[in-house]
C-alpha cells in the first residue's frame, strides 16, 4: 500500500495492524495484555480490525492488582464479552496472602509484587512467547528507546543495551525456549494520536477519562480519588467534590487526577493541544526515584 495515499492516522493504523498480524504469524502462543486504559482500548480495537470478521486468535490478559478503579473492572468485563475473546485475570495470590497494598507497603513494593511479579507469574504459567502491550515511545524516557519487538530473557528482564535492530519494519522474533518478546504496536503513536483515533473510530473508553464531579483528596500535590472505603483518610482530611478527569489509569491510590472541564472527546482533544505536561505526571510509581521506570522494566515490568 502506498503510504502517500493514507492520512497520518491511517498510516499508524496500518502499521499497527501489520505488527499484530506479524506476531500471530510468527509466534506460537501470543497474548494481549489488557490494562483497560485508552491505549489498551485502541490496541484491542486494532486487533479486532486485523482479524475481522473473525475473532483475534489470542486471549486478553489483565494483571489485576486488586486496587484498580471499580469502573475499570466493570469496563474490562464488558469489553471482553463484546469482543468475544477469552479473558485471563491473574492476581498474585502470594501478595494477597501477605496483605500487600499501596497504603500498607508503599507504591514501590506494591508495584513490584502485585504488577511485575504477578505479570511474570502469568507469563510463565501460560507459557506465552509474545505479549502485546499498549506502551508508546512518547510516554516516558525508557520507553522512548524500546524496540517494537522488545526481547526479554528467561527471567523476563529487559536489557536496553542488548536490543535487536529493526530496519525497514523488519522484526526479529527469534527466541530460545523460555525467552519471550514484548510487542508494542502503538510505539509510534502519540497521546494526541490516540485521542484523535478514539474520536475517529468511536472507540469506547472508561468514563474516568471524561471530566465529572468526583471525590478527591490532595496529597503531595496529587489529586487522589477516593474510590472505596479501603483508602485511609488522614486526620482532618475531607474528600472534596471536584471536576476532574484522568489522563492515565492505574491503581486508584497511585493515580492522580487533573482538574478539568473536558467532558467530551472534542474537549479532551482541545485540552491535549494546549497542555505542556506529561500524561504520566499523575502516576505516583514514576516518582519513586530517577529512572525508576527503566529499573522496573529491567526487572520485568511492562
Curated annotation (Swiss-Prot):
Alphabetical list of InterPro entries matching this protein: PAPS_reduct_dom, Rossmann-like_a/b/a_fold, SO4_adenylTrfase_ssu, Sulfate_adenylyltrnsfr_sub2
A Pfam family of this chain: PAPS_reduct
GO MF annotation, one: ATP binding
UniProt pathway annotation: Sulfur metabolism; hydrogen sulfide biosynthesis; sulfite from sulfate: step 1/3
Database matches in SUPFAM superfamilies: Adenine nucleotide alpha hydrolases-like
EC number: 2.7.7.4
Protein's UniProt keywords contain ATP-binding: yes
GO biological process, one term: sulfate assimilation
Recorded catalytic activity of this chain's protein: sulfate + ATP + H(+) = adenosine 5'-phosphosulfate + diphosphate
Keyword terms: ATP-binding, Nucleotide-binding, Nucleotidyltransferase, Transferase
Entry function: With CysN forms the ATP sulfurylase (ATPS) that catalyzes the adenylation of sulfate producing adenosine 5'-phosphosulfate (APS) and diphosphate, the first enzymatic step in sulfur assimilation pathway. APS synthesis involves the formation of a high-energy phosphoric-sulfuric acid anhydride bond driven by GTP hydrolysis by CysN coupled to ATP hydrolysis by CysD.
Subunit field text: Heterodimer composed of CysD, the smaller subunit, and CysN.
PANTHER family membership: SULFATE ADENYLYLTRANSFERASE SUBUNIT 2
Similarity comment text for this entry: Belongs to the PAPS reductase family. CysD subfamily.
Name by which UniProt lists this protein: Sulfate adenylyltransferase subunit 2 2
Top-level taxonomy: Bacteria, Pseudomonadati, Pseudomonadota, Gammaproteobacteria, Chromatiales
Amino acid at each position: 500500500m502506498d503510504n502517500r495515499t493514507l492520512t497520518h492516522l491511517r498510516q499508524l493504523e496500518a502499521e499497527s495492524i501489520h505488527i499484530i498480524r506479524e506476531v500471530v504469524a510468527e509466534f506460537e502462543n501470543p497474548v494481549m495484555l489488557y490494562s483497560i486504559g485508552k491505549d489498551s482500548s485502541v490496541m484491542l480495537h486494532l486487533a479486532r480490525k486485523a482479524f475481522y470478521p473473525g475473532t483475534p486468535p489470542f486471549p486478553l490478559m489483565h494483571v489485576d492488582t486488586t486496587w484498580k478503579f471499580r469502573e475499570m473492572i466493570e469496563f474490562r468485563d464488558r469489553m471482553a464479552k463484546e469482543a468475544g475473546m477469552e479473558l485471563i485475570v491473574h492476581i498474585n495470590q502470594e501478595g494477597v496472602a501477605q496483605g500487600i497494598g499501596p497504603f500498607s507497603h508503599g507504591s514501590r513494593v506494591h508495584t513490584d509484587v502485585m504488577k511485575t511479579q504477578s505479570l511474570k507469574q502469568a507469563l510463565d504459567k501460560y507459557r506465552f512467547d509474545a505479549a502485546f502491550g499498549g506502551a508508546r515511545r512518547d510516554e516516558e524516557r525508557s520507553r522512548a528507546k524500546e524496540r517494537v519487538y522488545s526481547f526479554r530473557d528467561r527471567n523476563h528482564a529487559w536489557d536496553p543495551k542488548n536490543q535487536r535492530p529493526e530496519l525497514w519494519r523488519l522484526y526479529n522474533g527469534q527466541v530460545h525456549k523460555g525467552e519471550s518478546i514484548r510487542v508494542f504496536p502503538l510505539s509510534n503513536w502519540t497521546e494526541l494520536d490516540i485521542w484523535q483515533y478514539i474520536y475517529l473510530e468511536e472507540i469506547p473508553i472508561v468514563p474516568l477519562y471524561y471530566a465529572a464531579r468526583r471525590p478527591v483528596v490532595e496529597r503531595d500535590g496529587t489529586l487522589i480519588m477516593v474510590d472505596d472505603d479501603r483508602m485511609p483518610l488522614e486526620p482532618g482530611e475531607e474528600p472534596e467534590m471536584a471536576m476532574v478527569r484522568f489522563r492515565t489509569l492505574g491503581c486508584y491510590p497511585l493515580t492522580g487526577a487533573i482538574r478539568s472541564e473536558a467532558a467530551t472527546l472534542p474537549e479532551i482533544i482541545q485540552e491535549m493541544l494546549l497542555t505542556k505536561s506529561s500524561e504520566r505526571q499523575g502516576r505516583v510509581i514514576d516518582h519513586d526515584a530517577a529512572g525508576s521506570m527503566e529499573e522496573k522494566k529491567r526487572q520485568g515490568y511492562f
